[in-house]
């Protein structure tokens, strides 16, 4: 029953055969399909390259003709035009300034001329002459003979002036009195004495030196302006001790060299003297 149904159905089972035959026919008529497609692809690529080259040429031409293009002779020409334009503008401005100055000068000249015309010219007045009376000739007094009475009066005149001598003596006495008072006042005024505080290091010969005797020798030095202070024994090493003693001296009377000379005179006990500290008071 199924086969009978298929026998009555209208189905084209051989259609693929006809399609293959038609394809082969057209292939033979138009040539191979692969070669044709390759040619079309090559032509399209060439056309695209040509179009791209045209676009690039147009863009380059448009860029060179634009205002921002400064490379090449075209750019130099545009820069030159800009500079010329700026120079022309500056020239016009300078011309305007010059014209303003000329107008101001002309106004000043007109003002001066008007002032000169309005003010009258002063007339030169001659100075008034003073009438001077003629000088009279003065006759010298006639010398008269001196009488004996006048000669006696001239002899009685004290030419040296005893009054002036008394005044000079009084002035000298006052001057001496003032000098004496000034000297007394200056003597009563206390004078500042420059003093210094010195710390001395007195070193013995060895550890067997009697340090008490050494200190006694040092303190036995008595000078004007020298005052001895506190002292102590400072260990040096190997059982040896040095005498460290303080003193105050007046700078004008006692010096460090004098102190060293006086202390080093005790050769049996003293080896050397050093200044450990020196301060102004």
Curated annotation (Swiss-Prot):
Record's compositionally biased regions (Polar residues): 115-132
Keyword Acetylation listed: yes
Modified residues (Phosphothreonine): 129, 147
S-S bonds: none
Keyword line: Acetylation, DNA-binding, Elongation factor, Nucleus, Phosphoprotein, Protein biosynthesis, Transcription, Transcription regulation
PTM annotation (Phosphoserine): residues: 37, 44, 60, 86, 106, 119, 133, 162
A matching Pfam family: EF-1_beta_acid
Modified residues (N-acetylalanine): 2
Modified residue annotations for N6-acetyllysine: 17, 107, 117
Matches recorded under InterPro entries: eEF-1beta-like_sf, EF-1_beta_acid_region_euk, EF1B_bsu/dsu, EF1B_bsu/dsu_GNE, Transl_elong_EF1B/ribsomal_bS6, Transl_elong_EF1B_B/D_CS
Key word Ribonucleoprotein present: no
Compositionally biased intervals (Acidic residues): 149-169
Any one GO molecular function term: DNA binding
Superkingdom, taxonomy of origin: Eukaryota
Disordered as annotated region, ranges: 113-172
Entry-linked PROSITE patterns: EF1BD_1, EF1BD_2
Catalytic (GEF): annotated span: 173-281
Region (Leucine-zipper): 80-115
Modified residues (N6-succinyllysine): 117
GO cellular component, one term: glutamatergic synapse
Subunit structure: EF-1 is composed of 4 subunits: alpha, beta, delta isoform 1, and gamma. Isoform 3 interacts with HSF1 and NFE2L2.
PANTHER family documented for this protein: EF-HAND AND COILED-COIL DOMAIN-CONTAINING FAMILY MEMBER, ELONGATION FACTOR 1-DELTA
Family as reported in the entry's similarity comment: Belongs to the EF-1-beta/EF-1-delta family.
Protein name in the entry: Elongation factor 1-delta
Name of the encoding gene: Eef1d
């Amino acid at each position: 029953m199924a086969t009978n149904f298929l026998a009555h159905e209208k189905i084209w089972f051989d259609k693929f055969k006809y399609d293959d035959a038609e394809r082969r026919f057209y292939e033979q008529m138009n040539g191979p399909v692969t070669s044709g497609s390759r040619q079309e692809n090559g032509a399209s690529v060439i056309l695209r390259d040509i179009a791209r080259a045209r676009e690039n040429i147009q863009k380059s031409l448009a860029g060179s003709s634009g205002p921002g293009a400064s490379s090449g002779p075209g750019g130099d020409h545009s820069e030159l035009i800009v500079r010329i334009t700026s120079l022309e503008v500056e020239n016009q401005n300078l011309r305007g300034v010059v014209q303003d100055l000329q107008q101001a000068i002309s106004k000043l000249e007109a003002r001066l001329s008007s002032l000169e015309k309005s003010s009258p010219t002063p007339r030169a007045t001659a100075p008034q002459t003073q009438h001077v009376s003629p000088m009279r000739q003065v006759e010298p007094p006639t010398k008269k003979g001196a009488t004996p009475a006048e000669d006696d009066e001239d002899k009685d005149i004290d030419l040296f002036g005893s009054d002036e001598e008394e005044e000079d003596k009084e002035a000298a006495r006052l001057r001496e009195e003032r000098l004496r008072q000034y000297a007394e006042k200056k003597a009563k005024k206390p004078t500042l004495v420059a003093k210094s505080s010195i710390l001395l290091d007195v070193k013995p010969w060895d550890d067997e030196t009697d340090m008490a005797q050494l200190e006694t020798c040092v303190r036995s030095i008595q000078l004007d302006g020298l005052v001895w202070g506190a002292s102590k024994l400072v260990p040096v090493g190997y059982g040896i001790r040095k005498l460290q003693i303080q003193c105050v001296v007046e700078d004008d009377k006692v010096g460090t060299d004098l102190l060293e000379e006086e202390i080093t005179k005790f050769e049996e006990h003293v080896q050397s003297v050093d200044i450990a500290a020196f301060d102004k008071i």
